UniProtKB/Swiss-Prot annotation:
Enzyme Commission no: 7.-.-.-
Entry GO terms, CC: plasma membrane
Main subcellular localisation: membrane
Protein name according to UniProt: Ion-translocating oxidoreductase complex subunit A
Gene encoding the protein: rnfA
Length: 193
């Protein structure tokens, strides 16, 4: 049980995929202008990351490894992620058409989010078992959601602030992301996995 808690703390805070490992920066910068959009993207990414982590583990352990075709893991994981994203897109379209319209192009772009593929590949590299793979994916998703939500809230406040002309737009966003990354580096050494 303690090991599972350490995996969650490690993926959420210590080894955050966006601010420490620099994976998933495209949706981080692209969807963070409004808090509502960021929350929707966070929920969709959490669902996709957790489910694709599970499906990728199963595909590797019960299809690729027994057949000696481990070299196909990247292509297989991309296909698995694409299927999970399509499933998520259909669910969101049926349950929340407004959220579906707000997310727009960013929902299909979860397929190419390097954090999703990175989690699947790191699960295999770390030789995580079934439960550890699910928790690793869920923790990475919660960490992504936490950072995206905090960053979008800060960007909304910055948009209302008096920012010097050269720093408006993407420049102040990058500075803010850098400061957040430095803050998360303070968690280094908290958990050693």
């Amino acid at each position: 049980m303690t090991e599972y808690l350490l995996i969650l703390v490690s993926t959420i805070l210590v080894n955050n995929f966006v601010l420490v490992q620099f994976l998933g920066l495209c949706p981080f910068m692209g969807v963070s202008n409004k808090l509502e959009t960021a929350m929707g993207m966070s929920l969709a990414t959490t669902f996709v990351l957790t489910l694709s982590s599970l499906c990728s583990y199963l595909a590797y352990e019960y299809l690729l490894a027994p057949l000696g075709m481990e070299f196909l893991k990247t292509i297989t994981f991309i296909l698995v992620i694409a299927v999970v994203v399509q499933f998520t897109e259909m669910v969101i379209k049926k349950t929340s058409p407004l959220l579906y319209r707000v997310l727009g192009i960013f929902l299909p772009l979860i397929t190419t989010n390097c954090a999703v593929l990175g989690v699947a590949l790191l699960n295999i590299k770390k030789q995580n078992d079934f439960m550890e793979s699910i928790l690793y994916g869920f923790g990475a998703a919660v960490g992504f959601s936490l950072v995206l939500t905090l960053f979008s809230a800060m960007r909304e406040r910055i948009a209302a602030a008096d920012v010097p002309e050269p720093f408006k737009g993407g420049a102040i966003g990058m500075i803010t992301a850098g400061l957040m990354s430095l803050a998360f580096l303070g968690f280094t050494g908290l958990v050693n996995i």
